[in-house]
């Protein structure tokens, strides 16, 4: 308990310090600095708010007990406040529990069709729409950065950014990070004339997005830049002039495309930012793997057997193999109703972190 009190005191002190800095006109005029402070302020605010409620509830409970000693009519107030104090204590403990340091960050997601040809590309498109619909419902902003479509309008590969509309402790990373891996689909493809169920797959990569384009630190000699015409349709919200950019990182072989912006210069800057995010993620995974804390990388191969989740169309069932989650509401999940699934994954992550802390 004493450790928790000390931690809360430190957080309150930091929170008040940030509040003072944000009130400084000079800081307010520096957009980059103000954005960073706002982000940290949003991370701390729920802890400070719940702690204030808890302090008040404890004081009210102490007063009610004292009055109940003199007048039993106040016992009902004691009975009301005791569970409230317990609830707030649990809520505060949950807020103080170890968290992923990137949870408040925006993300970039890449979706790639895997084994299964045209059917895999159509499924990759289904995944993209699922994430976009979920983002709309959950209050995240999203934009398509690059899109390579198949002949039937599926997705060969696609990159999307997801951002919080306002700084939040629970940013896009806190929910979308669980989507990295191989997703498997079982259904009758539109290209199948015999009505046979087939299995195909799509891969999803998720990584935090750098806050500033200025943070890109990639040597020009390590990249090859190609310019091409976008393949996206007008309705996809991507540019269709000859300004699309493809950047290949020669040391790693990573390839990033961007066609969202209206000029080659803007698309190159955005693609470099995405590439930096991927390189940062690779470096993070290498460090964590060395420390023995990292699970298997998100997508080692596009093999259908290496899957994190299966989408079974005939049975309307979704299965997450990491936590044994099963639900017969695939149709609603594909419509963006992913909250139950994500909360189950978050609960498992919290349990694992608490266990690791001992």
Curated annotation (Swiss-Prot):
Gene Ontology MF terms: translation release factor activity, codon specific
Main subcellular location: cytoplasm
Stored PROSITE patterns: RF_PROK_I
InterPro entries xref list: PCRF, Pep_chain_release_fac_I, Pep_chain_release_fac_I_sf, Prokaryotic/Mito_RF, RF-1
Annotated positions of the N5-methylglutamine modification: 236
Keyword Nucleus attributed: no
Post-translational modification: Methylated by PrmC. Methylation increases the termination efficiency of RF1.
Pfam families: PCRF, RF-1
Classification via Gene3D superfamilies: 3.30.160.20, 3.30.70.1660, 6.10.140.1950
Keywords of this entry: Cytoplasm, Methylation, Protein biosynthesis
SUPFAM superfamilies attached to this UniProt entry: Release factor (SSF75620)
NCBIfam families, alphabetized: prfA, PRK00591.1
Family the entry assigns: Belongs to the prokaryotic/mitochondrial release factor family.
Stated name of the protein: Peptide chain release factor 1
Organism in which the protein naturally occurs: Corynebacterium aurimucosum (strain ATCC 700975 / DSM 44827 / CIP 107346 / CN-1) (Corynebacterium nigricans)
């Amino acid at each position: 308990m004493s450790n928790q009190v000390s931690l809360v005191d430190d957080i309150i002190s930091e929170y008040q310090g940030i509040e003072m800095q944000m009130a400084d006109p000079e800081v307010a005029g520096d957009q980059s600095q103000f954005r960073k402070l706002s982000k940290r302020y949003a991370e701390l605010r729920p802890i400070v708010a719940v702690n204030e409620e808890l302090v008040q509830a404890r004081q009210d409970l102490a007063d009610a007990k004292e009055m109940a000693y003199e007048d039993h009519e106040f016992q009902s107030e004691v009975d009301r406040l005791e569970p409230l104090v317990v609830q707030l204590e649990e809520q505060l403990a949950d807020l103080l529990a170890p968290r992923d340091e990137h949870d408040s960050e925006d993300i970039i997601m890449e979706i790639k069709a895997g084994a299964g040809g045209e059917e895999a590309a159509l499924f990759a498109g289904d995944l993209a729409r699922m994430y976009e619909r979920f983002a709309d419902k959950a209050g995240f902003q999203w934009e398509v950065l690059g899109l390579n479509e198949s002949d039937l309008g599926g997705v060969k590969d696609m990159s999307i950014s997801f951002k919080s509309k306002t700084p939040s402790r629970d940013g896009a990373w806190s929910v979308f990070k669980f989507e990295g891996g191989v997703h498997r689909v079982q259904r009758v493809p539109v290209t199948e004339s015999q009505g046979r169920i087939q299995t195909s797959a799509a891969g999803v990569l998720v990584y935090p997005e750098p806050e500033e384009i200025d943070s890109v630190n990639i040597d020009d000699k390590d990249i090859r830049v190609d310019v091409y015409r976008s393949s996206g349709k007008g309705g996809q919200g991507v540019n269709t002039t000859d300004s699309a950019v493809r950047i290949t990182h020669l040391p790693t072989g990573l390839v990033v495309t961007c066609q969202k912006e209206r000029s080659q210069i803007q698309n190159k800057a955005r693609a470099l930012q995405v590439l930096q995010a991927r390189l940062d993620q690779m470096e993070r995974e290498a460090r964590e793997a060395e420390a023995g804390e990292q699970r298997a990388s998100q997508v080692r191969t596009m093999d259908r057997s290496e899957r994190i989740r299966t989408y079974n169309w005939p049975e309307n069932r979704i299965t997450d193999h990491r936590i044994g989650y099963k639900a017969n509401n695939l149709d609603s999940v594909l419509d963006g109703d992913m909250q139950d699934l994500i909360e189950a994954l978050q609960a498992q992550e919290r349990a694992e972190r608490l266990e690791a802390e001992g």
